[in-house]
Every structure is written in structure tokens, then in C-alpha cells.
Regions:
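The N-terminal extracellular segments of secreted preproproteins, especially immediately downstream
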Residues: 3-6, 31, 48, 68-71, ...
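His/Asp/Glu-rich metal/cofactor-coordinating catalytic motifs and the adjacent surface-exposed loops
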Residues: 145, 155-160, 169-182, 210-465, ...
Length: 777
């Protein structure tokens, strides 16, 4: 949609006039409600000439194997424990369809007396431990027969798919999509040049513009927010020495009395921030320089500024030793203890964020946990695998006493520990109590599964580099690229990726279609990410260009079944406190802030951060995505206070081209004297604040105009009865320059409102700032 750019100084009114003039034509160009859905069996349908993968998922996995076989043949199941070669991954495993297809094909081709083993075993033949599971005349058995015949004859469609498309979904137009992206990722609106490129080149302009957008400093601020939601290291910004207090002072003496404790109190927060945000700066460095994002785990370095380099005993040269914003790649050096057979200087074996002292402390271990918590985070963050979902089964606690080593011997336990413990072993060289303390002579626990990854066991000669050994294997796993897409998707949409539905769920077919569509898109984006040499920006672009970010409506009214299929598609994410704070400033020109220590402090990122659904990375680690009563009240307060502080200030600017909100009106304009300009400014405000390019006469514009007229009439009546005075309330006056805090010249001040127009416009701004279209993305 058409928008006015917000920078440190606003656009010229020429562009503003162009945007309003284009509103009607762009609306017509973007609308598709009159288009036909096209041929086929209905919106979103596809022909049923299926690829091998889709045929298996639809006709074999869901109705047969998932229901009949996985209970025993899953990892840790009875068949698996008894050494069965046929293993099926439950749907909680990313990539389970491909893995299970490979297993099914292998056994489909394996025959005994001319008949596939995959057909004999379910009938209880060939000493099947599970005995008879299917009848030969059942629909499930016939499905297996059909699959095996197709495998033998390679009778699958090349490129065929059961995945339903989005042909019945109406997407936001190119300009609206880009506006959404700029506000989310770069804290600004599109500028005049970008708008013109989109008007000239249409959809072809979007991807290059996104590439340029993701080079801006504001994008990296947003990127670090996104990854802090995962890593939660900002917990250690809680007080000025929180992060430093984590570090072992014998390994890092500069973190204590040798240097840090001698600093003035005003300087300590800078050092603390450098240590606390080290993993986030590493991520930003990798993305800024378009290095392979695999380095988030494999980097043999981390990022340091002059302060953190001193703490970490790193020999780095900086242009300015006092510049907290100068970051360089370097390696952490710990001071060793020769009495423990440690070298005087130990260069820690780096493995991206995994070896970061902040990561190790934020996800700590204990002498009994033995790094399993860290292993769970590796699986969750970088392999898209929730280990807690994989073993969702009843556990009899009394059975554990039947085993000397339950985590290895009890099937109820080892289903997770077989996957978890080898990864935990990669952290073996770190102290069980002093989280980041590296102990090169420490070894693993013989009672646990040996260090490794998947079915590969780590050689003991690799124990000294165990984390980097693990990292190299994690990033080569197909789940790594999927995890990156999951992170980008959640950050941009606020939604979690869909889980594979239960076959007994009501509406299973529709939920399955929804999952298949999303899974196909995620795998496609993951492939592009890998092909781009693991450039993280490719994953972000893939999500932004998808219907999950861009969808706004459907062609006509979808059927109840189609509504289920499209349930995860579309916009409507509640803005985070951080994003909303920047959006307010981008749109109005001023922050919703208070002054503290001579600085403007955003209220949404301080006083109201938790109340508006944000996190503190400590006690509150999950953002609220559905507003409650308190959040609604914060939104109303924001709208009222921002409208109060911005309206008179904007109207006081003599050059209309300098205004953010009122380029078409003056304080003297009333419905009687200049209704056309008032209507035009309202049309502009809908485009500027809400991203709505509405044609003149649209009901939404009429409602806003009626609000202005009604507020004006009510106020003028109270002025006439002297119930109200002409003076604006102190907080709403334009008396001081909000940027410089200096008093305005007398002739520029706007403190009186004899016609009540300032207050009527304040009501309009408050109304729009409290709108769903502003508070949500």
C-alpha cells in the first residue's frame, strides 16, 4: 500500500500527495475478490498424480504405518529394543517422512519366497515379534500392496504433489508487503526511492529491496532481538556486573579485581553488555558479512570489543580502546593452572555459540544433569527437534528400579537418552558446577552413552575438540536448515510451525493438508538457504515472500474444510514491545518515552515491557501473543499519550513538508471552511499509520471523518459553555522542541486551541494508533 517515509526528517508533501492520489488505483490493482479460483476440484486443490514421497505420506504413512507399526518400531520401542532392522521415526522428528519412506522402500524390495517382507510381517509371518497386525483383506493391507507394486514399477509421478496450493489466497500487494518488512526489520517506512522502484518494477523489485534492507544497522538490532528470544542471554543485562560475575576469576582475572572492579560504576555496564551479548554479536557478524550461517556453530572464533577482549585475555588491536561498538573476531584465552597440568594460556576450543560462556551459563549443567539440558537445547535450537515430544508416553516410575542403569537399559528412558546423551558428551570438558570453566583433562562418564551424534561414536582422540566435532555434524544434518527456517518463521509471524496432526483428530485430512503445505514450503526455503551458501537472509526472504507473511484474504468464502487448511496462513501477529516502540517513532516522528538521565527511554521497552507481553530473558522467557486486559489498557494509554504529545507539535511546524501527520491541514481548517483538506488528511493518515490505501468515500474514512466532526462539535459546545478553556493541557502543548528539549520561539508555540481542532485531531490520532492495524502486523 502507499506509505509516507519516516526518517529523522519526513518526506516532502509532493510524495505525500502522490501516495494519496495512488490510493484508489493501488487498491484496485491489489484486490482479487472478483477473480475466479481457476480449474480443478475447488480452491487450493491439486491433481492427485503424486510423487513417491507424497504418495507414501498420504496413503501409507498416515493410515497404515503411523497407526499400526510405530508403537513398536519407533526408536526405543519393543521391536527396536529386540534388534529389529525396520525402524520408523514418529512424526515429532523433523524429516520423518523421508526417513520412513527410505525404510519402507528398503523393506518393500526385500523378499522372502517371492513376497515382500513388508507384506509378510504384518500378517504375523516370518517370526514377527508383533504377531499378526493386519488382515489380508483389510484396506490397510491393500494400501501396502499398492505401495510395494508402485515401488517395484517406479510408478510415481515425477514432480506430482498432493500439497494444496494457495491459488485461492489473496496476498498483500508488493508495497504493503515491503512496508510490513521495513517496519518489522528496519524500524522505518519505505522511502520515496523504494516506493518508486516498486511502482516501476512491481514484484520484481521486492527481493532486491529486501536484500538492501537487510544491510541496515536497524536490521541487525532486530536480528539480535530475534535470537535473544531463543538464547535468552539478555538475562545478564539485569545489573552492571551480572555477566562478569559468571566468569571464573582464575581463568579470567580481568573480570575481577585485576581490572573490572577498579572501573568507575558508569563504565561497568559497557563491559557487562559486551560479555552478555557476545553470542548475539557473533550471529550479527556472520549475517552482516554474509558468511555461512553454519558458523553459528562451527566458528573457531567469537566477537569481542575492546572491553570484552581484555576480559577474555585476547590479543586484539582496536582503533579506539574505548569504543564499545568496535567488534573484532578473536579467541577466548583462559589462564591455566600448571598445578592441574594446564598450560599457562589455554585457547578455548571454539564452536560458535555453543562454547560461549554466556550460552554455557544460560543453559547450565549439574553433576547429575551431566549436560543433558544443553543437549536438549542443541536439538531444539539447531536441529528443530523437541526431545520432550519424542517420548510422549506413559512411564512407570517403579520399573526404573528393575535396571542398574535406567538411562541405558530401561526402554522408557533410553528412547530419549540414546539421542540426548551422546550430544551431552560433547560438552564433557566443561566443569559441572562452574559452567564456563574449561578443564582439558576432564573425561566423560562411562555409565552414559558415549559421545557422538546419531549412530556415529566420537573417537576418544577427538575429545579435546568435542564441541567442534559435534558442530560439524549438526550443520550437515538436514534438520539444521529446517531449524533456521523455523526460527525465521516464528520471528516474523509469531507462530510456531505446525505439528503433524494426530490421525484420530477431527478434521485430520484438512489438518494434514495444512501441515503438508507448510512442510513443503519450509523444505523449499531450506533448500534455497543451503543453496545460498547458508546465507541467513535467504531464509528471511523466503518467509517474507510466502503466504504465511503476506496473505490477507481468500477469494470468496472458503468452505469449513478449507478454513482448517488455511488456518495457519496470513497476518495478524501482535507486535512485540520493541517492534511497536520503533513503529510509533517511525510513524509519528516521536517515541513514546520518558526522560531518564538525560536520555529518552522508550516506555514499551522499560516500564511496560512485561505488561505488554514482552520478556526479560530471566523469569519471563515466553512472549504473549494474545492480548489480555492489562495489555489492552497499555495500548489505549499509548495511543492517548502519543496522540497528545505529537498532534500539536506536528501542527506547529510551519513547513507542511516537515510534518509526519498533518501535511494537508492547518489548525484553522474546519468542516465548514475546508472539509476537502480534512478528508484528504484523513485518507493520508489511514495510509501512513495503518497502511490502508483507501479510496475517497470508503466507509472507514467516513467513520474517521465523523469522529473528527463529532469530537469537534462536542468540544466547541463545551468551549461555548465555558466548561472547557482554550488552553491545551500542559502535556499536549507544543512549547518545547521534543528533539532538543529547548523552548520553541514564541511564534511557533501551539498552546491554545480556540477552535478545538487540535483536540479533534488528537482524538483521530489516538483512534488510529489504537487500531488493530497498527498494534498488529
Amino acid at each position: 500500500m502507499t506509505e509516507r517515509t519516516v526518517r529523522t526528517s519526513p518526506l516532502t508533501s509532493t510524495l505525500g500527495r502522490m501516495l494519496v492520489a495512488l490510493a484508489a488505483s493501488l487498491l484496485l490493482g491489489a484486490g482479487c475478490s472478483g477473480e475466479e479460483a481457476g480449474p480443478g476440484d475447488g480452491p487450493g486443490t491439486t491433481n492427485q498424480c503424486l510423487s513417491e514421497r507424497d504418495y507414501f505420506a498420504k496413503n501409507v504413512w498416515a493410515p497404515v504405518l503411523a497407526k499400526t507399526c510405530t508403537k513398536c518400531h519407533a526408536p526405543g520401542g519393543q521391536a527396536d529394543e529386540e534388534g529389529a532392522k525396520f525402524t520408523l521415526l514418529p512424526s515429532a522428528y523433523p524429516g520423518f517422512v523421508d526417513a520412513n519412506l527410505a525404510a519402507a522402500k528398503l523393506f518393500a524390495k526385500t523378499e522372502y519366497d517371492g513376497k515382500s517382507v513388508l507384506l509378510r510381517k504384518p500378517l504375523g509371518e516370518l517370526e514377527h515379534g508383533g504377531e499378526k497386525q493386519l488382515e489380508a483383506d483389510s484396506a490397510e493391507y491393500r494400501a501396502l500392496e499398492a505401495f510395494i507394486q508402485k515401488v517395484k514399477n517406479n510408478d510415481f509421478c515425477q514432480g506430482g504433489s498432493s500439497v494444496k496450493g494457495f491459488d485461492d489466497v489473496v496476498l498483500h500487494d508488493t508495497l504493503t508487503t515491503y512496508r510490513m518488512a521495513t517496519l518489522n526489520l528496519a524500524a522505518r517506512l519505505p522511502n520515496a526511492g523504494e516506493i518508486q522502484r516498486i511502482l516501476d518494477d512491481g514484484e520484481q523489485a521486492l527481493e532486491p529491496l529486501l536484500d538492501e534492507l537487510m544491510k541496515e544497522d536497524a536490521f541487525f538490532t532486530r536480528l539480535k532481538e530475534m535470537y535473544n528470544d531463543m538464547l535468552l542471554g539478555d538475562r545478564y543485562l539485569g545489573y552492571s556486573s551480572y555477566a562478569l560475575n559468571l566468569l571464573n576469576k582464575s581463568h579470567f582475572p580481568q573480570a575481577g579485581d585485576a581490572w573490572f572492579e577498579t572501573l568507575p560504576d558508569a563504565e561497568k555496564p559497557k563491559v557487562n553488555t559486551a560479555i552478555a551479548r557476545e553470542p548475539l554479536e557473533l550471529i550479527a557478524y556472520i549475517v552482516r558479512n554474509e558468511r555461512p550461517f553454519t558458523e553459528v556453530l562451527t566458528a573457531d572464533y567469537t566477537l569481542m570489543n575492546p572491553m570484552s577482549a581484555r576480559v577474555y585475555n585476547a590479543s586484539l588491536q582496536f582503533s579506539n580502546p574505548n569504543d564499545e561498538n568496535e567488534w573484532k573476531a578473536g579467541q577466548i584465552v583462559a589462564k591455566g593452572n600448571p598445578a592441574n597440568n594446564e598450560p599457562a594460556d589455554m585457547v578455548l576450543p571454539h564452536a560458535g555459540v555453543l562454547s560461549s560462556p554466556i550460552f554455557l551459563n544460560r543453559f547450565p549443567t549439574t553433576p547429575t544433569n551431566l549436560n543433558r539440558h544443553r543437549a536438549r537445547m542443541v536439538l531444539k535450537f539447531f536441529l528443530a527437534t523437541d526431545i520432550l515430544r519424542i517420548a510422549e508416553r506413559p512411564i512407570d516410575p517403579t520399573q526404573a528400579t528393575s535396571y542398574n542403569n535406567p538411562t541405558r537399559e530401561d526402554p522408557s528412558c533410553n528412547v530419549c537418552h540414546r539421542m540426548l546423551d551422546p550430544i551431552a558428551g560433547a560438552f564433557m570438558k566443561f566443569n559441572d558446577n562452574d559452567q564456563e570453566k574449561f578443564e582439558p583433562n576432564k573425561n566423560w562418564h562411562a555409565a552414559m552413552f558415549p559421545p557422538g551424534f546419531g549412530k556415529e561414536v566420537m573417537e576418544t582422540s577427538q575429545y579435546g575438540q568435542a564441541l567442534s566435532w559435534l558442530a560439524e555434524r549438526v550443520v550437515k544434518d538436514p534438520r539444521f536448515s529446517l531449524s533456521v527456517v523455523y526460527t525465521a518463521f516464528h520471528a516474523l509471524t509469531g507462530e510456531e510451525p505446525l505439528a503433524y496432526p494426530d490421525v484420530d483428530d477431527e478434521g485430520f485430512e484438512q489438518k494434514l493438508a495444512s501441515w503438508e503445505s507448510q512442510d513443503a514450503l519450509f523444505r523449499s526455503i531450506g533448500d534455497v538457504f543451503v543453496a545460498s551458501n547458508y546465507n541467513l537472509k535467504a531464509a528471511f526472504k523466503g518467509v517474507i515472500l510466502s503466504p504465511y507473511f503476506r496473505a490477507k484474504n481468500t477469494l470468496g468464502t472458503p468452505t469449513p474444510a478449507r478454513q482448517i487448511e488455511l488456518g495457519a496462513v496470513g497476518t495478524g501477529k501482535l507486535s512485540t514491545p520493541e517492534v511497536l516502540a520503533r513503529k510509533i517513532q517511525a510513524v509519528t516522528g516521536l517515541p513514546w518515552a520518558r526522560t531518564s538521565g538525560g536520555y529518552k527511554v522508550h516506555l514499551l521497552t522499560t516500564d511496560y515491557r512485561i505488561l505488554y507481553g514482552g520478556i526479560d530473558s530471566d523469569d519471563v522467557t515466553m512472549r504473549l501473543t494474545v492480548p489480555n486486559g492489562v495489555m489492552a489498557n497499555v495500548g489505549w494509554r499509548m495511543a492517548n499519550e502519543v496522540a497528545c504529545q505529537t498532534t500539536a507539535w506536528d501542527l506547529s511546524l510551519s513547513k507542511h513538508s516537515d510534518r509526519f501527520l498533518f501535511p494537508y491541514v492547518t489548525v484553522d481548517d474546519t468542516p465548514e471552511s475546508n472539509a476537502a483538506s480534512i478528508r484528504k488528511n484523513i485518507q493520508y493518515l489511514h495510509a501512513h499509520i495503518l497502511g490502508e490505501a483507501l479510496p475517497a468515500g470508503d466507509p472507514e474514512l467516513e467513520r474517521t471523518y465523523e469522529l473528527f466532526v463529532a469530537t469537534l462539535a462536542e468540544g466547541q459546545a463545551k468551549l461555548a459553555s465555558q466548561e472547557l478553556g482554550a488552553s491545551l493541557s500542559t502535556a499536549c502543548r507544543a512549547r518545547r522542541n521534543p528533539y532538543t528539549e529547548q523552548d520553541l520561539p514564541t511564534d511557533q508555540r501551539l498552546e491554545q486551541d480556540p477552535d478545538y481542532t487540535v483536540r479533534a485531531w488528537t482524538a483521530v490520532i489516538s483512534y488510529l494508533l489504537a487500531d488493530f492495524g497498527f498494534l498488529y502486523e
